[in-house]
Amino acid sequence: MIFFFKKRYHVFLKAPSIRLMPCSFFFFRSFIKVIFIIRCIFFSSLSGDSCPTQRSRSTLACMFTSVPVAPTVVPGVVYSSGVHEEWKEAEQKLLDGCLIHSEGDGATKQIKEKLTSRNSQSVRCDLCAKMIESRDEEQIQEHFQVHHAALSLWCREILASKDNLLHYGCIPSGHIVSCGNFVLESAATLDMGRKTFDVIERAFSQMSQVISCFVRNLVLFPFGSCVSCGCWDGVSDADFTAIGLQDMKKGKWPPEDEKKVILRLTAALRKAGFFFGELEPLVRTRVPVVRRVQKVRVPLRSHGEHDTYSVVWSNSKEFSSPPRMLVEAAISSTVERKDSDTVTFHFKDSLKAVKFFCNSAMCGPRDMEVSWKTGSQLPEMFSLDFDLSCRAQGVRNSLFLRKYFQQDPFVRTGYLFLKKWSKLYGINNAKNGYLTSYAMSILWVHFLLENGLVKFVRPADVEPIPDLSQQKMSYLPLLRDDGDGGERPSDVLKSPELTMLRGALGGLIPLFFLYYTRIRWDKVVVTLRVPGGGPPVTPDSLGWVEANEVKCGPLRDRVWYRLCIDDPYEDNFNLGRHLSPDKASFVKVQFMRALASIVAGRPQQLLVDEQKFAEETMPAYVTRLSVQGELRNLRPVTVSALRQLLIDSAGADCVAIYEASHNWETLLDMASTLNNKSKEGDDDAEGVTNNQEGEPPDHVESCEAPRRHLLCSKMHSIDDALLVAGPLGVSDANIPAGLLGVYFLARGRAFRTAEDRDNFLMHAEAVSAARARGCTTREEILERVADAIPSIVRNGTLLDDLLVSGSEENITVQSPVVVETRCAETVQRKKSKGSKKRKNAVRRGNHAGQGTCSECGASGTDLWEASDKSADDGLYCGACWKAYNCQKN
């Protein structure tokens, strides 16, 4: 009957006489909806729905809104994943505020009730982000005792030794000189010169053109370290913000629909040629942004006189006269006609090329396709990673800090070095709830103010509403007050003009760590609102006390006052609000450890990526323990027992740093798997016995227990060989398959630790890059290496081994030109209209366990196979499948 009504309904719509009867049409449409509701109630009662009335209300709401209703799951029925994926997508969109709905929307209420009940029963750990399925305080403490006990004990022991560190006395002058040399050499690589800074300026102009073309009434501004410090290292992310100046002057900015503005900006960038997968709109953060991260980073190229930017314009239908935009583009470019429907425009000016591309994508004919020519030079905006928001505070903050940083080179140089140090030591990581680069700049400037080393700048001296003149980014050399910058690290130590700067940095960096080791965080608020030298601002005066902390709720809503860093402009806003007691202790410990490294004369330890080493070292030591048979006594394997074994082997520092951002589930599963495999081998060996003497036969004895002993013996012999080989390592051809997880491999060599491997890679890549640039003599190569590796880190023995003829057979030398060409060939950016979906496109198939992604190379992640293995037999992670689906759609 339902089919009959639907069929008659469609015939009814086609009848021409009905168009003159709007009233009859309205009543018939209402009748069909009533029949559809009755059908839903009937089938929901058959499927065992406990509340068919509520189900029908949700269905009725779905007919008038765009929110999909949660599917009713019938036991014993296998459903396709598409319905549930749609439900999850709608839930995510509702959380992000992307759906428009009314208060009485039934589907909206279902989603809200589901989320509320789920959030009310669980809480997320602020260290490892694991969901704890209860808000009970005992279970929360149990989670911390199980997964983060080593971190807590490690922090307590180091903080208890603070008095011993402070009573050490004066730092030897030789260590201060070493620190100054290392800081200056490292900082020299953070400013690539005026020509490199021009790249980000041109990229900003191109981004401004894109925004003005697709999103009206918004003006793009730069901010961040490129504005405050006036230089760029050619690698760091850029920060941009799109602001409605007219609305801001009326007090209507940021807009209420800020999340929708971010989505509009994302759509505009995609229309300009950015891939779907490399743009990620983050609308659930405190400041919504769209983040661009490249999977294949395009090498930077300085603009040359003969550079051209090619746009391919094609149309499937011929037109009598060319559109006006083509005529205008032909005037300012070189036109190359390939066939009757494809034209290539070669522009000398990248900004004109971007303007033509955007106008074509927005106003071109319907059957038109415009793309950036594969293999040709791309505009500079495609070579940057960036964050794009629509808040104005970042512009004001950057201009305010620039007034401090431009006072003296040591101010901006010290900040950029500390910014790099804080990222490597894990305390500058806003994504995981630690400090931001902006907070680190406040800490540095506050320290300088308290010691009278910079002049006080009133925050009110910077206007809250940006001016159009502030769109221009002016270059400021890092190490000098004037010039083109781009100092070579090998020259900065020889320059007599930088002697004072080197001495200032060598003394101030240790004093900075000493200042924040001594500070009483419960008595002092770090602020730039008052001049230094006066009475400190206390947490009590601002109400930033423990009694006012928000300890529950979502991570982004929790507020702590263990480390108080005052924002210069936003009232009652603590930049350290996400530092829980455990995180605050970790930050304090890192300040102390940095000071201890300088006191011990090892400043190179300041730029060691401890987080990365811990993530790589822990699985390797679990494998080593399995080979040694240490895990066989742990049945079952527990976290506490495994933790103690790793502390004894890898060290307490490595385990604690790992626990600062991870839990033990992955390592526990790995250890249990290895232990079960070992146990299966033992059971097989014990099951085959000699009937007379109860001993295993010879073939079992030779295959099981001796095999483990041989593997362990081989591992010890490799360890001895590594001690003899030194920093060059040994050939990975000597590593058996069962020991590949124990050692760290790179360029055909094997190493005992991840730090040894990275040290080898640093030297090998420096030598390879020098040879690729045409350096042939030993002196030329060493000169290039001196620009890439600080003197205190440079290993002469390793360089001698690498420069001996024939010793670099396993080191791949890849020319930068080859890399650049390969990147240009793989990046194909186009915007087409009226394109059809691929009929035989593969979809995500079954879960295939964990491993290495065939696309991005991420290891230790969940993988899914393709639905059609004959078309694609790879295994890909969730992020790559998401990017593939976006591009496919």
UniProtKB/Swiss-Prot annotation:
GO terms for biological process: RNA 3'-end processing. Its cofactor is Mg(2+); Mn(2+). It catalyses: RNA(n) + UTP = RNA(n)-3'-uridine ribonucleotide + diphosphate. Mg(2+) binds at D237, D239. Gene3D superfamilies: 1.10.1410.10, 3.30.460.50, 3.30.70.1970. Keywords: Cytoplasm, Magnesium, Manganese, Metal-binding, Nucleotide-binding, Nucleotidyltransferase, RNA-binding, Transferase, Zinc, Zinc-finger. Zn(2+) binds at C125, C128, H143, H148. Residues 675-702, 829-849 are annotated as: Disordered. A zinc finger (C2H2-type) spans 123-151. A motif (Nucleotide recognition motif (NRM)) lies at residues 565-574. Binds 1 Mg(2+) or Mn(2+) per subunit. This is Terminal uridylyltransferase 3. It comes from Trypanosoma brucei brucei. The gene is TUT3.
